[in-house]
């Protein structure tokens, strides 16, 4: 995911910080009008304003959606344990021994579930890299698919450091495993759910290059498009950086608006709205290839990790910066959002219009 900082506020992208100078007069205007940043985050442009946390959960939808299916809740303590077990393998950059161990670990936690491996060789700036997406499939009772995703590898360009990506990759992979625990053995009332553990999200160089990142998501999105499955995908929901103890999920301009509305409705219903949408920005992440392929997408992401984003892509991204409560909030809100997607009916609003980077 790309790292960008606008002025004094952080917007996440992958590996580079850019600064936009803001005049003193402009800052004065912001202070007088009450506009600006929340938790040191900025909107993606000067014309955008932070979304109030008490706002209606349906800003583009006509009315609130009724959820379908029983309410599910993750075992957040188990999700934290999974996180610790993943980082214990060490830095898991592509072509390393630990990433092979993590793949085996993920598949081992999915015993009894239909699992497919989507393996390929990526032509990266560092050479040819074998990669594998791991997709767990849980059949539903309705014709359609909801895909949940997260990346599991760490940065190749940090391979000579002890960077373990506790929040950036490990926690979200652990969260998906905890969600899988809740789905295993159940007859789902709504759409089928596919859980995709994606490889190769991070750029292979410190400076973010879209054509040298998002490898797993680009490959899987194309595969779904080529075999026609993309037409059945009702939503692709990405989780990224959601274990941060100071949890603050942003509204992403590159996500599908009605899905963002459902996410906020879910958070509000569960009493967690104070952790959502204090700021608005654009995020370039694993959801983008699926959006380009015409699928509705949602990026559930906390873009500000540490003061001024100081923990992101550093050796400070360790388990002690995370919390069980943040994992619980993120996991339960995603599960509630799934119930709301099921409640949208067979013909939810189409994905466009939404901003998708070219």
Predicted regions and their residues:
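Solvent-exposed loop/turn segments at secondary-structure junctions
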Residues: 92-94, 121-124, 141-142, 152-156, ...
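Short, low-complexity, disordered segments immediately C-terminal to signal peptides
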Residues: 38-62
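Acidic/histidine-rich catalytic neighborhood of metal-dependent amide-processing enzymes
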Residues: 163-266, 274, 279-282, 286-287
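C-terminal motif of bacterial Sec signal peptides marking the signal peptidase cleavage site
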Residues: 33-36
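N-terminal capping segment at the start of a domain
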Residues: 58-103, 157, 307-318, 342
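Active-site-adjacent substrate-binding region
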Residues: 70, 119-121, 235, 242-358
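A non-catalytic alpha/beta surface segment that caps or lines the substrate-entry region
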Residues: 39, 70, 81-141
């Amino acid at each position: 995911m790309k790292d960008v900082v606008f002025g004094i506020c952080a917007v996440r992208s992958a590996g580079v910080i850019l600064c936009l100078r803001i005049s003193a007069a402009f800052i004065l205007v912001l202070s007088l009008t009450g506009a600006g940043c929340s938790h040191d985050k900025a909107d993606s442009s000067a014309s955008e304003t932070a979304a109030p946390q008490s706002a209606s959960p349906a800003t583009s939808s006509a009315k609130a959606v009724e959820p379908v299916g029983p309410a599910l809740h993750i075992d957040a303590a188990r999700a934290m344990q999974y996180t610790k077990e993943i980082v214990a393998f060490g830095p898991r950059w592509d072509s390393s021994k630990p990433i092979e161990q993590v793949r085996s670990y993920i598949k081992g936690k999915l015993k009894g579930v239909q699992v497919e491996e989507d393996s390929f060789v990526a032509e990266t700036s560092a050479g040819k890299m074998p990669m594998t997406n791991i997709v767990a499939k849980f059949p539903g009772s309705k014709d359609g698919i909801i895909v949940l995703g997260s990346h599991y590898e760490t940065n190749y360009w940090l391979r000579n450091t002890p960077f373990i990506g506790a929040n950036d990759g490990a926690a979200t992979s652990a969260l998906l495993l905890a969600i899988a625990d809740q789905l295993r053995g159940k007859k789902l009332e709504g759409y089928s759910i596919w859980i995709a553990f994606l490889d190769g999200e991070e750029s292979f160089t410190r400076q973010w290059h879209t054509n040298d990142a998002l490898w797993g998501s680009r490959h899987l999105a194309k595969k779904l498009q080529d075999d026609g499955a993309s037409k059945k995908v009702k939503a692709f929901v990405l989780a990224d950086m959601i274990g941060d103890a100071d949890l603050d999920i942003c509204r992403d301009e590159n996500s599908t608006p009605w899905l963002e509305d459902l996410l906020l409705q879910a958070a509000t219903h569960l009493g967690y709205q104070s952790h959502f949408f204090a700021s608005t920005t654009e995020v370039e992440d694993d959801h983008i290839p699926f959006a380009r392929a015409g699928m509705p997408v949602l990026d559930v992401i906390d873009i500000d990790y540490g003061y001024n984003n100081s923990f992101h892509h550093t050796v400070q991204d360790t388990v002690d910066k995370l919390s069980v409560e943040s994992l619980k909030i993120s996991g339960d809100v995603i599960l509630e959002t799934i119930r709301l997607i099921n409640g949208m009916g067979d013909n939810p609003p189409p994905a466009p219009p939404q901003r998708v980077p070219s």
